[in-house]
Every structure is written in C-alpha cells, then in structure tokens.
Amino acid sequence: MNIDYANLNLQYQNYKKNIDDAIVKVLKNSKFIMGEEVSKLEKNLEIFSGVNHAITCSSGTDALLLAMMAMDIQPNDEIITTPFTWVSTSETIALLKARPVFVDIEPDTFNIDAKLIEAAVTKNTKAIMPVSLFGQPADIDHIQTIANKHNLKVIIDGAQSFGSTYKNKTDSNLGDISITSFFPSKPLGCYGDGGAVFTNNNNYAEKIKMLRVHGQNKRNHHKYIGMGGRMDTIQAAILLVKLKYFPKELINRKIVADHYTSGLSDILQTPTIKPNKSSAWGQYTVRVNNRDNIQNELKKKGIPTSVFYPVSLHLQECFQYLNYKQGDFPISEKACNEVISLPMNAFLTYDQINYVVSKIKEHIS
C-alpha cells in the first residue's frame, strides 16, 4: 500500500470543478493583482476567525515581517520565541536586525514553555512570539499575563494552525497580531505561497495594508518603507473555494488524529492536546527511539514521513552569532532526535491509517 503524506492531488480532484472555474474566472478578468477575490477572501477569513481585520499577503514569512513592521520593531529589539520550529519565525526577526531570544519548549506539546518566558525578559524585550506548533496554540493566557506585566506585544505564529482554537477563540483571534500560512501543505493551503495577518487593532490593520504595497497610502505616494507582499488573485480564488470545505476537513483531520492515537498511544508518545484547546492537526507528530531506523523502515513499506525538526534553531549555522550552544535548550534538542511526523490529511482512509499503525507496531515491537 502506498500512502500520500498530504494528498493534495486527491483534495484537488474532490473540488476540481469549483477550483477550475475560479481560476478560469480570474484568467478571463485578468485582475491578477488585488482582484475582487482578494477582498472577498479577506472578508470570509474575518468571519471564519471572528476577527476584525484579515489582511492577505504573499506568504506566512511575509506575514511575520508585516506584523513586526506594523509594530515598529527596531534593530536590537529582542523578541522571545521558540527554538523548535521552522526557521521563518526567527529568520524574520533577524531580517529586521532584531534579536531572537530563545526559550525552551514543553516536552508534551512542543510549544514554548510559558513558565520559562519571564526569566528571558530584559529591558530590550519588545514582544513574545509563540508558535502554535503542529496545529495547537501555546499557553496564551500565561503568555498574555507576562506580556501585560512587562508592556510587551504578542505575535502569534499560527502558520501551522489555522482553524485551531483556544478557549473557543480561533488561533487567528489571539494576541495583538496573529499570522498564518497558506503554503500548499498547511491545513488550509493554496497552490503556491500565501499568508494572512489577523488583528483587531485598526491602526495595525491600516499600516499592514500599506506595508504590503510598498508602504503606499495612495497611488505612487509612500508613507512607509514597505515591501511587495500582496497575495495573487489566483491564490485568493483557490482559497475561497477551499475555505468552504475547510470546516469539514478540520473534522476529518481530527478523526485521523484520533484514530492514530487510539492505535499508537500504548507503544509511543502521541500528541498531547491540552484542555480548552483544539488542534488544526497541521502535523501528527510522535516521539520514537531509533527515529531514523523507523523512518527508513516505513519508507520501505510505502509510508512517507517527515522530521520537523532535525536541528534546533539555536544550533543552526545562521544563528551562530547569538552565541547559544549545545545543551542550552535540552528539551528542544531531545525532540529533534526523536520526533517523526506521520501522513496527515483529511482524506486518509481507516485502512490507510490502520496500515501505518500496524507497520509502526511491527517495527517497534
């Protein structure tokens, strides 16, 4: 049996006519930049997320940049974040000449350990940037309490978690600003790069809308130094179609996750979802010993897996200048040696899930 990790083609086949029609409409109208589909998508994202402002952009990475630029993050400002995530989180901080300050993670959720954050706050700290890793929000109440105490901003990196919830609020409606990514393999993905910034702050929203168009406040007049960060109309058209089916896909992803957990929880560490939270199941990530051997064995059986992430950010070459060293974040480092992500998409069948579970059990037992 061969299994597709994300199965984007099967998803496309299910929605083919609507997606094709949406793309053809854009081609006929030829409004490839900031066409009507962009504003329609933003309105629908606001409704789905329960937030006042959704501003689409060119990628999740650019969404992080736009969020920090809107907050006027300056060189040498410090932003507290996690070392166990995709590089964009800290890369964008560094691109603005600010400094990522890492705090270790919780061993069960892989999210930043809120109990350790306050010790990392200095006079230069301007914001906390938790990542909703693998689809589940971090301990936002605890983080927000620290932020309020020290007059800090909170930016939610929800690149992997669109559709998740924390105390019945969507992940996009947390913090001062939240972002997400619409990279194709994300819970809600387009057919290229795309992202969005979410906020209830009118001033941030107004500024972000200018920043994504080179800081332009009216045609050929530029209030800020900005960037070319708009979402293409075709991507917006695709997302408009897929957003209609997204609630059902979220349900299906949870069913897949629950079935995995039922079959695997007695032999390895399966994901922990904390009370008052739901996950968008951007990944289904477990811990195993002899991770590389297990990954190779599963590959032989036609089961694709991924490792997110093999090297903690504080040990990446690009962040050597931060002067962290091996052993500084032991929970993150241990996770890098043990995590493996199993196939996760809304179209996995029970037979496929059972096959994955059985092959893992064969190798571990």
What does each model-identified segment do?
Residues 9, 38-43, 48-54, 115, ...:
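PLP-dependent aminotransferase class I/II
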Residues 69-158, 165, 363:
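PLP-dependent aminotransferase-like
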